[in-house]
Amino acid sequence: MKSRSYNQYCGLAYALDVVGERWTLLIVREMIAGPRRFKDLLDGLPGISTNLLAERLKNLEQQAVIRRRVLPPPAGSTVYELTVLGQALEKTLLELGKWGSQFVPQSMEGATVLRAGSYALTLKTFFRPERAQGINETYELHIDGEVLHVQIAAGEIQVQQGAAPKADAVFTTDTPSYLQLLAGQLQPDQAIAEERIQITGEPGALDRFLSICGIADVQAETAS
């Protein structure tokens, strides 16, 4: 399919020529947590067709936003990952995600299941570096079968798909409970008592994680 262009001599217009098509930014989002197989992307983007995903990936590859590579044995899978040019979109996506959070409804009813890319974007968007000073911990999250790990060090955050080589704490929960914890709608003690979250490791790590990455305070600041 021939790519369309706004044909405007403007940086924003040219940016939209590259990433403005439907699904494109969500495909980029899915790679924020690391390389993804075609099937991973298809599973993480309910509603996109196989042909359309292939077309969007081809366009992004042609624009050098992503690249394909084959993982070494024993995996041997072909994965898609962001190039340096693609990684430069992260800051823009974080700001766009923060702006878009004011339109997110309270209930997930009718919405599709979240995947690692969406979790990673949310964690990075609402990360509070001023609260992370002096904390050097790695948290492993298991959310309805999705596994990712969050590393906090030197006031910075890194989020990657998959289990951590060495985690200080492992949190296992479901999507509604996880989102309610982040939003401050569910308190950690209540979640533990009701067995809505299981913690392996230091129990206080959950409070630190929510203080650093929770969205309750940010939502209050936005509302004011």
Regions found by a protein language model. Give the residues of each.
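Short hydrophobic beta-strand motif reused across regulatory alpha/beta modules
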Residues: 65-66
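C-terminal interaction segments
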Residues: 164-224
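Residues within the DNA-recognition helix of helix-turn-helix
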Residues: 56
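Alpha-helical DNA-recognition elements
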Residues: 59
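N-terminal helix-turn-helix DNA-binding core of bacterial DNA-binding proteins
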Residues: 10-49
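Basic, amphipathic "hinge/linker" alpha-helix immediately C-terminal to the N-terminal HTH DNA-binding motif
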Residues: 20, 72-95
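Acidic, aliphatic-rich amphipathic alpha-helical segments
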Residues: 85-149, 203-224
